[in-house]
Structures are given as C-alpha cells and as structure tokens.
From Swiss-Prot:
Keywords: Host cytoplasm, Late protein, Repeat. The keyword Nuclease does not apply. Plays an essential role in the assembly of the icosahedral capsid of the virus. Allows the assembly of 3 molecules of hexon protein p72 and formation of a thermostable trimer. It comes from the Viruses. Induction: Expressed in the late phase of the viral replicative cycle. This is Protein B602L. Sequence repeats lie at residues 161-164, 165-168, 169-172, 173-176, 177-180, 181-184, 185-188, 189-192, 193-196, 197-200, 201-204, 205-208, 209-212, 213-216, 217-220, 221-224, 225-228, 229-232, 233-236, 237-240, 241-244, 245-248, 249-252, 253-256, 257-260, 261-264, 265-268, 269-272, 273-276, 277-280, 281-284.
Length: 614
C-alpha cells in the first residue's frame, strides 16, 4: 500500500470479514494505533535519571483525601436498623395524642398502660440510638487502627462542605433518630397496639387479666409489633391487628389464667402478626429509603411470580446484591453466555488466570461502587484547598515539583564493563536513580519490578530534591520497621493465647505462601525464641541477644591466633552472655539493680530487685 488508510481498511474488513490482511499492513496498522511506535533499534544505550515527584504528591493527596472522606462518611452514616421507615409524625405529637386519648378513656386518671407505653417508646429509641453509637464506635476504632488521622485538624471542612453536612449533621441525626423511632414506634405501637389492645384486652380479659395484660401486652406488643410492623402500612396494620388481636386475645385470654398471659399473648401476637404482615408485605409496594428509585431485593423476591421449579434458583440469585448484579449482567450481555459456559465447565483452567495472585483476588472481590467514587471526587473538589494544606503539612512534597529527566552519556550496549564503570565513576555526582535505556526503543519508566532491579542509587548534589528522596527512603525503612514490630508483638500475643505453631505450619507456609509481597520480616530464630519464651517479649529479646553472643564467641574461638582487640572482645562478650543469662530470671514486673559490697577488701556483687512501675 502506497499510503496507509485506516478508514479504507476498516471498510474492506466490514464488507468482507474473510479478507486476508498482509503482514506489512498489520505492521503499519500497529504502528498507527500504538502510541509507542517502533523505531529502528540502536546498538547504544543512554544513561539517564528522572524524578516523578508530582506523582508522589498526587498519591499522598489522594491518600489524605480518602482518609478524610472515610471519616466524614462514618459521621454521616446511620446503621440500617435505625433508618427511618416513615416520618409522618414526630415523637412529641405521637406522645401528646397518646396521652390525650388515654386520658379521655380513663377519666383523667393516669393509667399504668400509658406510662408503660411511653416508656416502651422511649426505651426503643434509646436501644436503637445505643446500637447506632456502638456500631459507629466499632468502625471508628477499626479506622483509627489503620489511619491515625484527625479530620478536625487536617481538613476541617471534611464534614462542613455541604449544607446538610455541617453543624446540622449531629442535630439532624439526633432529631432523625428520635423522630424516626418515635414515628415507627408511635405509629405502629400506639395506633395498633395501644388502641387495639387497650380496647380489646380490657373488654376481653375482664378484671382478672386487666392489670396483668395492661403491663404485659403493652410491653410485649410494643416490642413485637414494632419489629414486625415496621415495614407495614400503618392503617393496614391497625385494622388487621385490631381484628386479629380481638379474636385471638379474646379466645386465648379468656381461657388463660393471669400467670400465663405474658407468654400466651407474646406468642400469639407474634405469630399472628408475623403471618398477617407477611401476606400484607407480599402485596404492598415498597422502596429502599436510601435509594428511592430501587426496590430492595427482599421485597422484590416477595413480589415476583416465580414458578416452583425456578424458586430455588431465584432465591440463590437474589440472596445478595452482588449475585443479582452478576446474573443480570450476564443475561444482558449475550456475548458472555458462551464464555461463562466454558468457564463453568472448566473452572480450574480459568481460576489461575482470573485470580493469578492473592492480592488480585482480594481486589477483584472488593470493587467499590461508582457512586462511592463520585462522592469521594466531590469531597476532594469541595475541600481541595484544605486537603492540599493538610498534605503539604504531613508530607514534604510540594505540588509544583513536576516530572524531570536528564541524559548523562551514551555508550555501546555490548560493552558491559563500560556501563558498570560509568555507575561507579559518577556515583558521588549523580543526585538521583540511574537507568540505562536502549536507544530506538520505548522505555516505560513506571515502578515495574524489572525497572527497579536496573536502578543504581547515588546521592550527592541538589540538596532540595536529595532531602525529599532521602525522606522517601527513610519512610520506607521506618514503615518496614513499624510493620516488623507490629507482627512481632502480635505473634507473641498469639503464642501466649494459643501456644506455639503446629509442626506442619512452616511446611504449609513454604508451599502455599509463594506470591510476592512482604516476606521474612521475622527470622526463624526469632520465631523459635518467641515460642521458647511462651510469647514473653522480654525473655524472647534476651534469647535473641544470647544467640548473638554465643555466635560471636563461636567465631572468635574458631580463630587460631587472636589479636589483643579480639581477646578483649571475647572477654567482653562472655560477660555480656553471663549477664543476659541472669536477666532471664528477672521477673517482668521488677528491675534488677546490681550492688557491689566490700567483703574483706574484696568486692562482691549482690543483686537487688525493685518494683517496676507499669
């Protein structure tokens, strides 16, 4: 082809898909579509260094913003069991209505049922609020274990960026929780249980059961009907429970004595209301209050007209949102049907490909929804100045440092000796990592494993960037040491609680833990000394030091002729070994104090133990 034309090639392929394309055409197509076009290979390599501090800054900005967003989202999060089902009335109006109604029925004489009903409503509100606080506290402790972060200090507007996220967050949650629980309990329990059971049980149970049912039915029905009728239409539940409780309580309570009314009414009302409300729910339209446009799966299951032979499969598919989305995606994409069929027929061939490493499998199972990304993106945009200031105060990077590179020299790639000489000759003059790139080929500068193995690290000039790069390297070392200490103490605690590892565990780890990642943070000797000390960190450290001393003594004694310095070192090491062996007998809550006593003009060492302040 004299001149390559992609449009013409595409037209020909669409008209006749069986048309063969020449190798030259494919090569031209590849060069036109590939941003990294192929050039003629060169036999020379160039030495260069580059810095990508902008990328490092962006990573830390993203990290700072993500942590702030997670804490902000936790503050605004309300557990599912405390979310409002409906907010038609407030707690105050419900209580006023209840008191006025029962005052008229009891001729202004306070009834025990009035007090118990109010207490039941308040107790329900308190219980749900307490559950919400406990859930948030648990999640907050988990986040702070992984992210030592204070959104009040680092990004103040993290939860004041929107009108509803500002100071109204606390009051809104408090008012919502109160009004929500009030509405749920008041609408359901008051209208259904109070009026129904009050009128029904008083007329039915007569004077013997009046005092018993007044307190029992209110408490029992309040808690039972509250959980069952929470998702049920108020008017429907009221009329249904009214007719049901009249017949049920009348027949049951009439033949039941005062001592058994509590269990009887609780069981009858729970079973009766559960059956009735299940039928009501099946024929009632609901929406997810957190997403009004979406019908919850458990509601959708009840509204579906499913044949008996498909019921088990539909239940399994709609058991979780993930399963439902996966099945729906496969059904809507015909091109996946054959591939999914092949995958299910031969899962062993597909698993190593789709889940090639443990980290890949973990990430593929925890895919964040798109709305989370957009919420996070909005949070970054709305708090950008604060997040930049926080990032610059936490980390030494500045946002105005960009990508830069420098080329030092070009040598022939076949002369490996000359390449090595360049590295060592200029090691005191080059300020950054040195990479060798092949001329005529594109070189990816990302942090790939192959690239990291080719870098040589030299630092001398350019103090500003040098300090930043040194800080980056120091962060890596500190992070590794912190991680190592964390693993060491957790392993010690594990040994204290469950004992040493099983004999076959080391074989299992060497067989299955083969993917790249954090390895060998604790040596074999350290693990053995931890087991020898039964998880006692202090004794394990002494055992480590004893091993070091014994190894040093062994090396010195293996030499034939020791120098004076080596002899002094041998004597010193033996004394350190003896002292370490004595330290093994020191209790954990005490401190050993060496005292020297003059005994007939001869100094003798005595040991004194003093209580340690823990």
């Amino acid at each position: 082809m004299a001149e390559f034309n992609i449009d013409e090639l595409l037209k020909n392929v669409l008209e006749d898909p069986s048309t063969e394309i020449s190798e030259e055409t494919l090569k031209q197509l590849y060069q036109r579509t590939n941003p990294y076009k192929q050039f003629k290979n060169d036999s020379r390599v160039a030495f260069c260094s580059f810095t990508n501090l902008r990328e490092q800054y962006i990573r830390r900005l993203i990290m700072t913003s993500l942590i702030g967003y997670v804490f902000k989202a936790l503050q605004e999060w309300m557990p599912s069991y405390s979310k409002p089902t409906h907010t038609t009335k407030t707690l105050l109006s419900e209580l006023i209505t209840l008191v006025d109604t029962l005052k008229q029925e009891t001729n202004d004489v306070p009834s025990e049922s009035v007090v118990n009903t109010i207490l039941a409503i308040a107790d329900s509100c308190k219980t749900q609020t307490q559950k919400s606080k406990e859930a948030k506290t648990t999640i907050d402790s988990f986040l702070r274990e992984h992210f030592v972060f204070d959104p009040n200090l680092h990004a103040q507007s993290a939860y004041t960026c929107a009108s509803t996220n500002a100071d109204t967050s606390a009051s809104t949650n408090a008012d919502t929780s109160a009004s929500t629980n009030a509405s749920i309990n008041a609408d359901t329990n008051v209208d259904t249980c109070a009026s129904t059971n009050a009128s029904t049980n008083v007329d039915t149970n007569a004077s013997i059961n009046a005092s018993t049912n007044a307190s029992t039915n209110v408490d029992t029905n309040a808690s039972t009907n509250a959980s069952i009728n929470a998702d049920t239409n108020v008017d429907t539940c009221a009329s249904t429970n009214a007719s049901t409780n009249v017949d049920t309580n009348a027949s049951i309570n009439a033949s039941t004595n005062a001592s058994t009314n509590v269990d009887t009414n609780a069981d009858i009302n729970a079973n009766t209301n559960a059956d009735i409300n299940a039928n009501i729910n099946a024929n009632t339209e609901y929406t997810d209050l957190t997403d009004p446009e979406r019908i919850p799966l458990h509601i959708m299951q009840k509204t579906l007209n499913v044949p008996n032979e498909l019921q088990a499969d539909i239940d399994a598919i709609t058991q979780t949102p993930q399963g439902y989305r996966a099945a729906a995606h496969i059904l809507q994409n015909i091109e996946l049907h054959q591939s999914v069929k092949h995958m299910l027929e031969n899962p062993r061939a597909f698993k190593p490909i789709l889940f090639n490493t443990k980290i890949t499998r973990y990430l593929s199972q925890h895919i964040p929804p798109q709305d989370t990304f957009y919420k996070w993106n909005y949070y970054i945009e709305d708090n950008y100045e604060e997040l930049r200031a926080a990032t610059e105060s936490i980390y030494p990077e500045k946002p105005d440092l960009e990508f830069a590179f420098i080329i030092y020299d070009v040598v022939d790639s076949s002369n490996q000796q000359k390449i090595d000489e360049f590295y060592y000759k200029y090691k005191d003059q080059i300020f950054s990592e040195v990479s060798s790139i092949q001329l005529g080929n594109w070189t990816l500068l990302g942090s790939f494993k192959a690239n990291r193995e080719r870098y040589n690290y030299f630092n001398q000039n350019n103090e500003v960037i040098k300090r930043i790069l040194d800080r980056h390297e120091e962060d890596l070392k500190i992070g590794k040491e912190i991680l190592r200490n964390t693993i060491y103490h957790k392993k010690a605690k594990n040994i204290q609680e469950t004992g040493p590892d099983a004999p076959g565990l080391s074989i299992y780890n060497s067989t299955f833990h083969t993917d790249s990642g954090i390895k060998g943070l604790l040596s074999f000797k350290e693990l053995k000394n931890l087991e020898k000390a039964s998880g006692n960190v202090k004794k394990a450290r002494e055992y480590d030091f004893i091993d070091e001393c014994e190894e040093k003594i062994k090396q010195l004694l293996s030499k034939e002729n020791l120098t004076s310095d080596e002899k002094s070192e041998l004597i010193k090491t033996k004394k350190q070994l003896d002292n370490a062996l004595e330290m093994l007998n020191v209790p954990d809550d005490t401190i050993r104090v060496d005292m020297w006593v003059n005994n007939n003009n001869k100094l003798e060492k005595e040991i004194l133990y003093t209580k340690a302040e823990l």
